[in-house]
Each structure stands twice: as structure tokens, then as C-alpha cells.
Amino acid sequence: THLLCRPGEVKGEVEIPPGTGLVGINSMVRHSVAGSPYSDTRIGAFMGKKIINDIRARTGRGALDYLTELTVEEFRAQYASEIPDKMVGSQFLTKHKTHDDPVTKIQPDATYRVAGPTRHPVEENERVLRFMEALRAAKNGDEKSLTAAGECMYGAHESYRDNCQLS
């Protein structure tokens, strides 16, 4: 099923090519999205979105509702250099007032990773689109596309680990 996570819209089905299987492995490692690493990553992504929206406002463009509205090319060309790698909560609040997330609260004394958590959803959205296209191509007989789909899956894990530092 293809979900568009803005906030969660089912866009349709993407068939798994004949002769292809997907395997999930239960590592038995417990993960909770309620803990600080996940909250801090979410805060960092919302900080990045706020910085981008402030830039957009200064240049007469409308605000983004979701980071995934940006292409990777747009993000890299127009915003990536403006997003700090890390930022202390109090510095962010002084400059931007809020991060516009009703679910999390910025702690003034905490240091948040901003660049990686902001980059992840933009790049992940593009990876998902490439993954679906690869599955469609494989269904039409292009077996090299299955390798491309696998590379997208590895890329998703690497981004989650490196940009979000959650794996």
C-alpha cells in the first residue's frame, strides 16, 4: 500500500513483482517512539521546517505543511546550507519563537540535531517514490530494478541511522 504521509493518505497499491518476496526479521529489540531520542529527532525536524518556512516567508513563498513537499534538489539548492547541524533550544526559541509542533516541547537547555532530522524526510520521500517505480519496472520484466529497490531500502536504513541517529 502506498501511503502519502501528509498526514496519512492511502494513494493506492503497488504490486510486488511475481517471484519476489519481502522478508521482515524480528530482532526482538524493543523500540519505543515515546522516548527522548525520537522526540528530539521530531523536534529537530520541526525546527528545520520552521527555519525553512521563515526563509520562504522572507522570499514571498508560502509555508510548507510538510518537509516532504520539497524535492531533494530544492532542499539542497535552497535550504540545506541554512539549516544548522545542531542548535540549542534557547537559541532557536529566541530567533524563531516556536517550532509549530503541538506534540513536542523544546527544552531551552537541550541541544538538538537539526540538519539530519530535517534532511531525512525529504530524502526518504524521494527514496519511496524511486522504490515504487523500481517495483513497477520489475513487474514489467526489468530485474535490475529489484536491485534498485533493495538499494532504496538500504538507503532508508542508512538515513534513519545517520540522519536521525535512531537505529
What spans do the regions from the language model cover?
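C-terminal nucleotide
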Residues: 1-167
